[in-house]
Amino acid sequence: MLSRRSFTTTLAAAAATSLVPRLLRAAGVTPARNVVLVHGLFADGSCWSDVIARLQPAGLNVTSVQNPLTTLDDAVAEAQRVLDRQDGPTVLAGHSFSGMIVTEAGVHPKVSTLVYVAARAPDAGEDYTALAKNYPTPPASAGIVFDGDEGRLTEAAFLRDFAGDVPEAKAKVLYAEQEPFHKALLTGKTMHAAWRSKLSFYAVSTEDRTINPDLERFMAKRMGATTIELKSSHVSLISHPQEIADLILQAAGQRR
């Protein structure tokens, strides 16, 4: 398995130039038959189910990572283990917090393209919390509660601020399935920024109450991502699974 420190400074230096996104776009998408999906906070791997159901008929080999939500190192290591098992070019997609994992683990040599779904996309070594403070605080933040070192979202905040455009009955099921996260997870910083060397795609949720939509737009623009905007809550992968599947198919070289 690749360690977080095993990548050369040559890659980092080459990726630092703002020309990289344009050069990657000119080179085109590398066809991929593998897709690895990573979930964020207040969820588990099943949150991708409706997207998976649209990717598999296209012949894609899809794996949804069960993110441990303990520390960033643990989460990245789990994603890397799944990436190690892929048999060729792979699209790595993440929702919400797992954009941190995509950004870090995305330097894995089997990853061909990156997809961010209303996701964090920090630069290498960047303090995401400090970056987010440049934008109004999203309402969901007030709904996080802790039992000791474990955090979760209250039901009211989940239904209103996380999954506001999902039918209430389904949103309540998703609320019951959310995986608690450990406080230590929030202290991690990415050491690499895969989007500086990999072709990237981004789905902005314009009605997001968990990550500020303008912050999403900033991160998408900074990485030079192919970007779509969806009139969606934070969980566009659930409320707009076809659009998210289409974006992943585009990243896999099966759509234009």
Task: Pin down the residues of each PLM region.
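C-terminal segment of N-terminal export signals and the immediately downstream linker at the start
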Residues: M1, P21-V38
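N-terminal export signals
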Residues: S6-A26
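Conserved HGGG/HGGXW glycine-rich cap/lid loop of the alpha/beta-hydrolase fold
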Residues: R33-L72
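Active-site loop/oxyanion-hole signature of alpha/beta-hydrolase fold enzymes
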Residues: P57, N61-V91, A105-H108, Y128-K133
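Gly/Ala-rich beta-loop-alpha elbow adjacent to hydrolase catalytic centers
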Residues: G94, S98, V102
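Flexible "cap/lid" loop of the alpha/beta hydrolase fold
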Residues: V111, V115-G148
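Conserved serine/cysteine hydrolase catalytic core
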Residues: H182-M223, E229-S232, L237
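Post-His helix in hydrolase/transferase enzymes
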Residues: I238-Q250
